Regions:
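Solvent-exposed, non-transmembrane regions of membrane-associated and secreted proteins
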Residues: 1-205
Length: 205
C-alpha cells in the first residue's frame, strides 16, 4: 500500500516538474507581434493543420517525456491533477503508437488532435490511488478542464457535458458529430475491466 502511494507521488511529481520546467517554458515564450491574425487562425482551424509546424515552428516530436512524444498538456483543477498528453501524428491523425506510453502518463488513443475541431480520445489508467485517470469518477458535468496543445501552444478551456459508463467494446463516441466544435473524450477502465468510464467535454463558450 505504501509503495502504491509513493508511486503515485513520484509519477505526479515527475509530471509536475516536467510541465513546469520544460513544457511551460517553451509554451510561454511570447513575441511582441501576434503570431496569427484572426483570418489566419480561422483558416488554420478550417484546415485543421497548424501552419509551419506550429505557431512557434515547433513540431510534435520536439519534446519528449520519459521517451515518448508529447502532444500537449491536460489540467483538471477539480481533482488537482495535470499530466503531459502523449501521442504521435500518423497520416494526419493522432494516436499513441506504443501501448507502454500509458504506463507513464495519459495518451491520445484516437482523433483529430488536441484543440482541433472534432473529437480527440484521451485514455489513461484508472488506479485506486487516483493516479492518471483514477480520479475521473470525481469529475462532474459542468467542471472545467484545460488542454494545451504542443503544436501551437494554445491553452483552451473545456466544459464537461456528459459522463457515463459503457461496455469496453463501445467506440460509438469516437467519431461523433461535434457540430463544428472542439471536443475531447476522456476514457478509463472500470474496476472489473469490462466497462469504461467516459467523460465528454466541449470548448467553453
Amino acid at each position: 500500500m505504501c509503495y502504491k502511494y509513493y508511486q503515485k507521488y513520484k509519477l505526479n511529481s515527475d509530471a509536475d516538474n516536467f510541465l513546469t520546467d520544460e513544457f511551460d517554458n517553451v509554451v510561454n515564450q511570447t513575441t511582441d507581434e501576434p503570431l496569427y491574425t484572426d483570418e489566419q487562425e480561422n483558416q488554420a482551424i478550417q484546415e485543421q493543420t497548424p501552419k509551419n509546424g506550429g505557431t512557434r515552428g515547433i513540431s510534435s516530436d520536439a519534446l519528449k517525456y520519459k521517451g515518448y512524444n508529447v502532444a500537449g498538456k491536460i489540467e483538471m483543477p477539480t481533482v488537482r491533477l495535470q499530466y503531459p498528453i502523449l501521442g504521435d501524428k500518423v497520416n494526419g491523425s493522432w494516436q499513441v503508437t506504443d501501448a507502454n506510453a500509458i504506463e507513464v502518463s495519459v495518451a491520445i488513443q484516437y482523433g483529430v488532435g488536441l484543440n482541433n475541431v472534432g473529437n480527440t480520445v484521451i485514455m489513461g489508467h484508472n488506479y485506486r490511488s487516483g493516479l492518471f485517470f483514477g480520479s475521473n469518477k470525481k469529475l462532474q458535468v459542468g467542471d472545467t478542464i484545460y488542454i494545451t496543445d504542443w503544436e501551437t501552444g494554445t491553452r483552451r478551456a473545456y466544459t464537461i457535458y456528459n459522463k457515463y459508463t459503457t461496455e469496453e467494446s463501445d467506440t460509438s463516441f469516437y467519431q461523433r458529430n461535434t457540430n463544428g466544435k472542439r471536443e475531447f473524450s476522456l476514457v478509463t477502465c472500470q474496476s472489473n475491466n469490462s466497462y469504461i468510464l467516459v467523460v465528454l467535454a466541449r470548448e467553453a463558450e
